[in-house]
Regions:
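Bacterial Sec-dependent N-terminal signal peptides
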Residues: 1-53, 235-240
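Catalytic-loop region of hydrolases
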Residues: 51-140
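Short beta-to-alpha linker loops that shape the active-site pocket of alpha/beta-hydrolase fold enzymes
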Residues: 119, 145-149, 218
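Glycine-rich "HGGG/HGxG" loop immediately N-terminal to the catalytic nucleophile
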Residues: 148-160
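Alpha/beta-hydrolase active-site loop
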Residues: 161-179
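Alpha/beta-hydrolase fold nucleophile elbow
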Residues: 182-192
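Short glycine-enriched nucleophile-adjacent loop
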Residues: 195-206
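A catalytic-pocket lid/entrance helix-loop region that shapes and gates access to the active site
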Residues: 209-249
């Protein structure tokens, strides 16, 4: 009787505390649930805000079907994108291909350099790559791989669409789209065949860019130019020229 008398108040205390304890537990669960919802909302907000910059703007260009981030020691952001281009810009119904375009970001208020590459763009993927004018002007960089080279090769390869005018049409489409992101001054530049491409781009679309800077721009007179042969027939010695000819054959 003595022990049962001492146990009874403890049981009563437990029973009397139970509603309070349950209330605290429910309140704690509601607090945790609210905190979890708030954290989820903040996380979603951060993810959304992370894409309100260049990446978000790239996603708004309908011609871009794929965007991948690239490492860069020169720019705050760098991406390789794949831009849908018609094989024939005058007749889009004839098909399309994906053109590789590399974008490097210096600032929305900065000028933009479009590199009119004459061949492939693989070297521009390197983290340390930065074109000279882009460095000098602290400018954005839009690097366009030439059609029918590397990852910008149509399938099947219908060579009728590999023309200077089609290349200029490609550059015009890229520039027009990216001016929605970079509305400042634009500079077109290229080296060798890329320089030739910059000149031809200016010829077909004289108002697309503010400045054209071709670094070397060989302009051919035709499929057979006619200016190289006289020089090659005289340079060096007969023996050396034959050796080079034999090596090529």
């Amino acid at each position: 009787p003595f022990l049962s008398g001492r146990q009874q108040p403890e049981e009563e205390n437990r029973l009397s505390l139970s509603p309070i304890t349950n209330k605290h537990i429910m309140k704690d669960l509601r607090t945790r649930h609210t905190a979890l919802l708030l954290f989820t909302f903040l996380l979603a907000s951060v993810s959304l805000s992370a894409q309100t910059g260049l990446q978000q703007k790239l996603s708004e260009i309908s011609a871009i079907t794929e965007t991948q981030p690239l490492e860069s020691t020169e720019f705050s952001e760098k991406y390789v994108t794949y831009f849908t281009q018609p094989l024939d810009h005058r007749h889009p119904e004839k098909g399309s291909f994906r053109q590789r375009v590399i974008v490097a970001h210096a600032g929305f208020d900065r000028p933009t350099v479009i590199i009119t590459e004459g061949y492939g763009a693989a070297y521009a993927l390197k983290p340390q790559y930065r074109e000279e004018l882009s460095r000098l002007l602290n400018a954005n960089m839009v690097f366009v791989e030439y059609r029918y080279f590397l990852e910008s090769t149509p399938e099947p390869k219908d060579w009728r669409y590999l023309t200077a005018e089609s290349s200029a049409d490609d550059l015009h489409a890229v520039t027009t789209a990216f001016k929605n992101i970079y509305p400042g001054k634009w500079i077109a530049t290229g080296i060798s065949k890329g320089g030739q491409t910059a000149l031809l781009y200016r010829t077909f679309y004289p108002d697309d860019v503010d400045v054209s800077v071709p670094y070397v721009a060989p302009l051919c007179y035709g499929t057979e130019d006619g200016r190289h042969e006289p020089f090659l027939k005289k340079v060096s010695t007969d023996e050396d020229r034959k050796r080079i000819t034999d090596f090529q054959l």
